[in-house]
From Swiss-Prot:
It comes from the Eukaryota. Residues 156-177, 206-281 form a coiled coil. The gene is Fez2. This is Fasciculation and elongation protein zeta-2. It comes from Rattus norvegicus. InterPro entries: FEZ.
Length: 375
């Protein structure tokens, strides 16, 4: 009987037969479902049970139902909050005081090694703003320069020489060692100039040291722009200097060629005069001989001279005489001096005339067509 009572208690926890059958129908295979459908009325019961389960699972929430808590995602922080080891490590982290560097043993060893001593600020010393203003006025470069200019006016070289001569005349004896000589005075003057330069440089350095970073950047930009402008000006001046030097060389070569041609023309004129004198003397001698020979009107020498003169006029001068040395170069006076190109062309013509070259006519035509009568 005891065994029947135990089984009776066990039967109370079992589900009814219908529910077991429904579970079997749910877990059955498609073939079994197909057989049940073919068998009879089990399919409507299965469909109704499925609808009941779906309605229980997806039933709508009503006001009578208690509110459900929102689903929260599991994060690393939520996991660490429940971790005992993490809590033990982080609970005492904020309670530890930071290390005081000044009172540490490492700091004392550091001071002993570097041999540093801390000097306290003496608050008892009074600070006067008037001293700072006086120092600023003393270091003002503009005021220093203006005061120097007002006190000592600039002297010209002639005034300095006159003053030195007066000092030399006023000195009673040159042999006296106590009176300083001219070289000593000049050396003293140079020393004063050097001291003035050094003081101005030191004051400029102090002013630069007192400038801020922004002011230094502005000063640097101004210096760079000034350097750029001065560089461009220097390039222009160098180019102008080269042009002036080239122009000077062309002018010097033209003047030297002109002087050489003029000297050769003078020599040629002198030789021509001597030849004329000799010819005149020979012609007078021939006339005298002709007067002594009344029967002969023409001589062989006279006929040969006439023939030679005709040939010279027809085919030019003989080989010994200069043909192009006495060439006249046409020149038109303009408002200003001749240009460098004109001087170069004239120099070429003068060199050709000096060498008695055959290029003189072609150079003259080019000069007339390009310079005097340009098309």
């Amino acid at each position: 009987m005891a065994a029947d009572g135990d089984w009776q208690d066990f039967y109370e926890f079992q589900e009814p037969a219908g529910s077991v059958r429904d579970q079997e129908n749910c877990n059955a295979s498609p073939e079994a479902g197909a057989g049940a459908h073919a068998g009879g009325d089990s399919f409507p019961a299965l469909a109704s049970s499925l609808e009941e389960k779906l309605s229980l699972c997806f039933r709508p929430t009503s006001d009578a139902d208690p509110p459900r808590a929102a689903v929260r995602p599991i994060t690393e922080r939520s996991l660490l909050q429940g971790d005992e080891i993490w809590n033990a490590l982080t609970d005492n982290y904020g309670n530890v005081m930071p290390v005081d560097w000044k009172s540490s043993h490492t700091r004392t060893l550091h001071l002993l090694t570097l041999n540093l001593t801390e000097k306290g600020m003496s608050d008892g010393l009074p600070f006067d703003t008037s001293d700072e203003e006086e120092l600023r006025e003393q270091l003002d470069m503009h005021s220093i320069i203006v005061s120097c200019v007002n006190e000592e006016p600039l002297f010209t070289a002639d005034q300095v020489i006159e003053e030195i001569e007066e000092m030399m005349q006023e000195s009673p004896d040159l042999e006296d060692d106590e009176t300083p000589t001219q070289s000593d005075r000049l050396s003293m003057l140079s020393q004063e100039i050097q001291t003035l330069k050094s003081s101005s440089m030191s004051s400029c350095e102090e002013r630069v040291k007192r400038l801020s970073v922004s002011e230094l950047n502005e000063l640097l930009e101004e210096i760079e722009t000034a350097i750029k402008e001065y560089s461009e000006e220097l390039v222009q001046q160098l180019a102008l200097r080269d042009e002036l030097e080239f122009e000077k060389e062309v002018e010097n070569s033209f003047i030297s060629a002109l002087i050489e041609v003029q000297n050769k023309q003078k020599e040629h004129k002198e030789t021509a005069k001597k030849k004329k004198k000799l010819k005149n003397g020979s012609s007078q001698n021939g006339r005298n001989e002709r007067s002594h020979m009344p029967g002969t009107r023409f001589s062989m020498e006279g006929i040969s001279n006439v023939i030679q003169n005709g040939l010279r006029h027809t085919f030019g001068n003989s080989g010994g005489e200069k043909q192009y040395l006495t060439t006249v170069i046409p020149y038109e006076k303009k408002n200003g001096p001749p240009s460098v190109e004109d001087l170069q062309i004239l120099t070429k013509i003068l060199h050709a005339m000096k060498e008695d070259s055959e290029k003189v006519p072609s150079l003259l035509t080019d000069y007339i067509l390009k310079v005097l009568c340009p098309t």
